[in-house]
Each structure stands twice: as C-alpha cells, then as structure tokens.
Amino acid sequence: MQIVAIIPARYGSTRFPGKALADLAGKPMIQHVYEQTIRASLVSRAIVATDDRRIADVIHQIGGEAIMTSTDHETGTDRLAEVARGLDADIIVNVQGDEPLIDPAMINQAIEPFLGNPGLKMGTLKSRVKCLHDFLSPNVVKVVTDNNGYALYFSRSPLPFFRDKWQDLKDEAFASGRLLCFKHVGLYVYQRNFLLEYAAMPQTFLELSEKLEQLRALENGIRIRVVETEFESLGVDTPDDLNKAKERMKQG
C-alpha cells in the first residue's frame, strides 16, 4: 500500500505571515514538520505542497520533496487534491504545515484503521480536553463520536453540552476525566480517490457556518473514523504560539 503524506504550506498566513519559515530551534518551522512526518513508519513518501518558492527551496535544500501549487486555492484540501491528482498512491495523509511538534506516532495512529479496511474513506484524530478554557474556546474544535469511533459532529461550540453538570465546569473536572470531552486534532487521512471526490463537492451549510471543512464530508453521508491519541501537538497560528513551541522543545 502506497501511503503519501502531503504537507500544505502557505507563506501568506493571515495571523502570522511567513510562519512556515519562522525560526524554531535553528530550523524553519516547515522543516520540523517535514522531518517529523518522514519519521512515521507507515508513510512511504512525504511532500510539501506550497505556493511559495522560498518554502520549496528550504525543503529541497535538505533533500526533501516539495511541489509548487496554484496560488488560487481557497482551502488546504484544494491544495492537497491538486498534488494528489498526480500521485500513484492509495492513501493520502494531510499533515498540517503549522504542527512542528507532531509526533510520528500520531500519524501512524491515524493511518492504522485504513490497513486492511478498503471501505474506509476518511479518518482523523481526537484527544482529551483537559481544561475549561479549551472546552469553551471557539478556536478549539470539539468532536463527538459514536460507539464505533465514527464522528457524529464537530463544532466550535462546547460539545457535548453537560446540561446537568454545568455547575461542575472546572479545570479539575476535565483534567480528572469526570467530564469527558474530546478536541479534534487536525490531521486527516483519505483514500486518494475519495479525496478527489471530496475536494470537488460544493461547500455545505454546516461547513460554512462553523468554518470546518470536515463537516462537508459528514453532510454528504461520509463516515469519518476518529482515533483517540494521547500525544499532544501544538498548532502555531501566532508568534505567541511559536514561543510556546520553543519552550516545549527546550523541555524536551
């Protein structure tokens, strides 16, 4: 089975322009993401997909693979699909270009349900919410799943709504697991052929309402397998996030 990881990376981030090339422990951030990705044992090949020559040059200089893509894509999925069309691959893994601390084991965990399961079209990860701030924050996407580990819904709202335990909404309740809630970890795995279909689907009501692309799949009746991970990554959306990543790396 040919499994290719694609890392979409733009230079023109709204909140943090140039973040893909921001220095993190002596390396551009995108280099950290690429190096962590190729360490995943189930990944056959890793490619950075970018619309900026500077990002491609960084990857080429370390002997990696980067492909220049159109500057007109509205979403990361569109950029992913452009590259996937030209690949001879069975499975495509979408690794976010702003996750320099991603553990290779997380990538393997997301891929594993696809091994020997040709009917599975899309998968992702979740991890425990451990504080009240994350539960309430619209910037932390929550997910609920059925008893078989398939997504029921993703939302920026508190999910689930603990109607009879609202007075118990404290950090300790989440940290101890007394209130069990999960946040979405934005790493996706697709059957290649399904990815191309998915990218061509019109945007949907819930997707546009929540600004969450994965809802397009749910609204079209596609089951999304969600695997729980205990590994903690860190998305870098702002300079402050970059400083947090630097501190995490110092701590080992």
Swiss-Prot record:
The keyword Cytoplasm applies. It is an enzyme of class 2 (transferase). GO terms for cellular component: cytosol. One of its GO terms (molecular function) is 3-deoxy-manno-octulosonate cytidylyltransferase activity. Pathway: Nucleotide-sugar biosynthesis; CMP-3-deoxy-D-manno-octulosonate biosynthesis; CMP-3-deoxy-D-manno-octulosonate from 3-deoxy-D-manno-octulosonate and CTP: step 1/1; Bacterial outer membrane biogenesis; lipopolysaccharide biosynthesis. Its main location: cytoplasm. Gene3D superfamilies: Spore Coat Polysaccharide Biosynthesis Protein SpsA, Chain A. InterPro entries: Cytidylyl_trans, KdsB, Nucleotide-diphossugar_trans. This is 3-deoxy-manno-octulosonate cytidylyltransferase.
